[in-house]
C-alpha cells in the first residue's frame, strides 16, 4: 500500500510539473496574440487598397501580363504550405496538412503536378518524412513574420511562375523548373475560437472586383501608363498576399496554442485533483490499517496478562 501511495505522489508531482509548462505556454501565447491581431488588422487596409487599385487598372486598361493570363494546358502547380515552427498548438498543423492533401488531390485529378514550397519546421519535417522533394523552405519566423520574409517568399514564387514550364515533364523536382500556377495554403484567423485552413490560387491572378455605389462612372488617367503602373504594383500585391497569409497564420497559431495549452492546464488540474483524492484514500486506508494493528496488538498483550 505504501508503494502505491508513493507512486500516486510521484504522478501528482509529474502532473504538477507539466501544468507549470502548459500554463507558461498559455500565458506566453496570450501575451503575443494581441500584437499578432493588431499587425493583422493594420495590414488588411493596405491589402484592400492595393487590390482595389489593381482592379481599377485591370478594368480600365487592356493589360496582357503573364500573371493575368491563364496558360494553356498547365502541368505544374506551385503550392506554398504555411505551417508553424513549433508544436503544442493543437490541430493547427494537422488541419493545414489535411487541406494541403486535398489540394494536391485536386491538382493531380486536373493533370497538374504539385511543386512544394513550405514555411515552418513542421511542414519541413512532415513532407521530408514522406519523401517529398521540397523546392524551397523558410523557417524561424512563423510566429512573427515580417514584410521582408514575405517579399523573399513572393520573389521566389514569382520567379518560378515567370519561368514557366519548359519541358512539360510530369514529375516532382527541385531542379528550379518553373510552374504554371501558384497556390497558397494557410490558416485564416476569424476569431480566438475559430480558425480555418484555406487554399487560394494567387497566380494567374484573379482580380477581385469591389462593388461600388451606383453613380456616375469615374474616369481615370494613368501616369506614365497603365501597363507600367500595373507592373510596378503587381509585385507588391503578391508580396502583400503572402504577407497577409503569414500574419493570418501567425495569429491562428498563437490562438490555437493558447487554446490547446489552456485545455492541457485544465486537464492537468483535473488529473491532480483525482490523483490527490486517490492518494488521500490510500493514506486513510494505511492509517486505518496501522490503527487496527496497534489495537490488535494491545488486545493481544492484555489477554496475555
Swiss-Prot record:
One function term, GO molecular function aspect: ATP binding
Principal location: membrane
Extent of the signal sequence: none
Any single biological process term in GO: proton motive force-driven ATP synthesis
Membrane topology summary: Peripheral membrane protein
Protein's cellular compartments: Cell membrane
InterPro entries noted in UniProt: ATP_synth_F1_ATPase_gsu, ATP_synth_F1_gsu, ATP_synth_F1_gsu_CS
UniProt KW GTP-binding keyword: no
Keyword vocabulary terms for this entry: ATP synthesis, Cell membrane, CF(1), Hydrogen ion transport, Ion transport, Membrane, Transport
GO CC term, one of those recorded: peptidoglycan-based cell wall
Gene3D superfamilies linked to this entry: 3.40.1380.10, ATP synthase, gamma subunit, helix hairpin domain
Pfam families linked: ATP-synt (PF00231)
Transmembrane segment boundaries: none
Protein task: Produces ATP from ADP in the presence of a proton gradient across the membrane. The gamma chain is believed to be important in regulating ATPase activity and the flow of protons through the CF(0) complex.
Subunit-structure text: F-type ATPases have 2 components, CF(1) - the catalytic core - and CF(0) - the membrane proton channel. CF(1) has five subunits: alpha(3), beta(3), gamma(1), delta(1), epsilon(1). CF(0) has three main subunits: a, b and c.
Protein family per UniProt: Belongs to the ATPase gamma chain family.
Protein name: ATP synthase gamma chain
Species whose genome carries this gene: Mycobacterium tuberculosis (strain ATCC 25618 / H37Rv)
Gene name as annotated: atpG
